[in-house]
Amino acid sequence: MKIYIEGEKIRGTFQKRVNRFIAEVKVGSQLVVVHVANTGRMKELLTPGAEVLLRRVNEPHRKTNYDLLMVYHKGILVSIDSKLPNRLLYQGFINKEIVAFDKFNEVKREVTYGKSRLDLALINEEKELVLIEAKCVTLVKEGELASFPDAPTERGTRHVRELTEAVKQNIRGAVFFIVQREDAVRFTPNKEMDPQFQQAVTEAKKAGVEFYAYNCIVTEDYIAINDELEIF
């Protein structure tokens, strides 16, 4: 499960975050405005002076000419692009690289269930359905403990509760936490940041929703799902 990072990539120095979607980065002597590909807080990563990796984008409709893709943090690269977990899992399911789901031969994206649009759905020859939600994780605490979310997430809580209801209707449901850095060895929901999300996860586990977490190998050229992590 590997996604190559295409386009012209440029290093810069992070200056400040203007809002959830926009930041200022210094490239050489020039201050440029960049799109932040993740609405999470990422306060431990996006600090003034942090070295970051940008991608140049030349599209007329865009308000910015750069995407902020990665942050150099404590000797490693951290990918912040929140769209990549969906793409990585889609590739993994298509190529049958995830053993627990290798009997499913049809993969659909952006599937509506209840009041939510979930990331993926799998269907096998017996027409059994699995609903999948992917979560982008960038936060690692205590040197090795990955945690989600890094900001309160009503949307994430709603997705977990929708999957809980689906499982109660005999539909298989799973949440994948994709930690877009390689230093994580364990994962836990971030109760301190969002107790409602943690409670939703606890209830979902009791109902039978499946939870998986993986770290990733991240380079300037690609990101790949690596090791499965212990969840507690």
UniProtKB/Swiss-Prot annotation:
NCBIfam families: sfsA. This is Sugar fermentation stimulation protein homolog. Belongs to the SfsA family. InterPro entries: SfsA, SfsA_C, SfsA_N. GO terms for molecular function: DNA binding. Transmembrane segments: none annotated. HAMAP family: SfsA (MF_00095). The gene is sfsA. Coiled coil: none annotated. It comes from Alkaliphilus metalliredigens (strain QYMF).
